[in-house]
Amino acid sequence: MKTSESTDRFGGVAGETTNRTVLLLAHTGRPAALRSARLVHESLTRAGVTVRMLASEIEAIRKTGARMQPVEVVEPGADAAAGTELIMVLGGDGTLLRAAELARPAGAPLLGVNLGHVGFLAEAERDDLSDTVRCVVERDYSVEERMTIDVAVYNGGRTSAAPAVRTWALNEATAEKVESGRMLEVVLEIDGRPLSRWGCDGVVCATPTGSTAHAFSGGGPIVWPSVEALLVVPLSAHALFARPLVVAPDAVIALEVLPETTDGVLWCDGRRRVELPAGARVEISRSKTPVRLARLQQAPFTNRLVAKFALPVAGWRGRAAERDSG
């Protein structure tokens, strides 16, 4: 526990609040998130930290009849998090992925408080809210970087000089079929060489962070965040060779939607949609711009898996020292 005069992990003084700004985001569809946002806002303001919020979220809180203390109002966009030291997110993984769109351009770390279901990206739970606010005020947290991927869509396949769309993803980019009664026909390419053709429901291209999301539901492996790799997971592929693949982190993955197939659609983190007409080409590669996550504790990733997925570990004995340390 730090005192008000202790040095924080960023070289400042814990409790020092001069010119400090935190962007606060909440899931406006959850009453609990709106109540928590109001309490967090009041606590940070009392501590001398400027709170910035989106205009739409302030309006959602006011519609509940709650009165708001002074707050810095911004609109969503690339500059929403500019100049902030942290983005505090109240909600589930979907809310955190929305917040990542604001955090990535500014390089601001995300600190998630889970008010959803699994909340795999969140660092704290609802019952930890008061202590989480204290950690923010005292700068009692560390920051880790998570790999993201750049995504380029060429509507003319290899003949396109420039991509029709450029976007990115923290978890995954997923090419999916549009028509329920027809398969999407694609060819997978790794580093400029064709690997396999699949008739499938779709293909997930994921980061290690995304290995516990859509890729996991499709039968892909869980990859520790410290492992540098990219994943390719075919969904319900009608092929003998249709296994999840783990490829080098600097590999260039390409999916070509065959001209004779139905149109598809590309989803990035389940939020950004891009149409994939027949003949389109999707190229996916490691991005130079990571997303930063704030961590309150240095618990092993194994512990997070056990807690979030409620994995059965009863009967484990291990070494005596390991049992004693929990």
From Swiss-Prot:
Catalyses which reaction(s): NAD(+) + ATP = ADP + NADP(+) + H(+)
UniProt key word Transferase: yes
EC number: 2.7.1.23
Subcellular locations according to the entry: Cytoplasm
GO CC, alphabetical: cytoplasm
Functional description taken from the UniProt entry: Involved in the regulation of the intracellular balance of NAD and NADP, and is a key enzyme in the biosynthesis of NADP. Catalyzes specifically the phosphorylation on 2'-hydroxyl of the adenosine moiety of NAD to yield NADP.
Protein name: NAD kinase
Source organism (scientific name): Thermobifida fusca (strain YX)
Gene name of the encoded protein: nadK
